[in-house]
From Swiss-Prot:
It holds the Pfam family Lysozyme_like. This is Pneumococcal vaccine antigen A homolog. SUPFAM superfamilies: Lysozyme-like (SSF53955). The gene is pvaA. Gene3D superfamilies: 1.10.530.10. InterPro entries: CwlT-like_lysozyme, Lysozyme-like_dom_sf. Its main location: other. It is found in: Cell surface.
Length: 199
């Protein structure tokens, strides 16, 4: 029994070390975009900041694709139509800045603006009419009743989403319903990047 426990602990330790290495590698890849993000923000009148944009890049692609902010769909309506990282960041920052301005105007929290990056700007009005604060419950309802049906999922079909923040809340997402945990993942990744930047 002790030998089995020892093996399990060794395996767990190796897994944690490996995951730490992967996360550190991904963070360094994202941080390589920092000068580009700083330049783009300096050229825009925006409430967005460097750390938030980098956390969104980490959440979207971990810096591993040309369209680092997954800006194509909001730009052209088609996936992967942006093939240049600078263009992706410029469009992503413009959209985020627009969302932050709308959120301030509507009197809702800034994390609603971040969630709207995933759900679309109409989410800001939805939150304004439902308490002014982005929550997982409101995001879930909006995903199920607005986003998913608009993209063809009228039956409420779900799938399992393997992310620690999702697992805490049951781990399901609605097919074609966006990511109800998006703003929380970005928030978590802010701290993750900050932590990994120390090493």
């Amino acid at each position: 029994m002790f030998r089995l426990l020892k093996r399990a602990c060794s395996f767990l330790l190796l897994f944690v070390i490996y995951q730490s290495f992967v996360i550190h590698h991904n963070v360094q890849r994202v941080l390589a975009y920092k000068p580009m993000v700083e330049k783009t923000l300096a050229e825009n009148d925006t409430k967005a900041n460097v750390d938030l944009v980098l956390a969104m890049i980490y959440t979207e692609t971990k810096g591993g694709e040309a369209d680092v902010m997954q800006s194509s769909e909001s730009s052209s309506g088609q996936k992967n139509s942006i093939t240049d990282s600078q263009a992706s960041i410029e469009h992503g920052v413009n959209l985020l800045s627009h969302n932050l301005a709308l959120a301030e105007e509507a009197g809702v929290d800034s994390w609603t603006a971040v969630q709207a990056y995933n759900f679309g700007t109409a989410y800001i009005d939805y939150i304004a009419k439902h308490g002014g604060q982005n929550t997982v419950d409101l995001a879930t309802t909006y995903s199920k009743t607005v986003v998913a049906p608009s993209l063809g999922n009228t039956s409420g079909q779900t799938y399992f989403y393997y992310h620690p923040l999702a697992l805490i809340s049951g781990g399901k997402l609605y097919k074609n319903g966006g990511n109800i945990y998006y703003s929380r993942e970005v928030h978590f990744n802010l701290y993750l990047i900050e932590l990994m930047s120390l090493f």
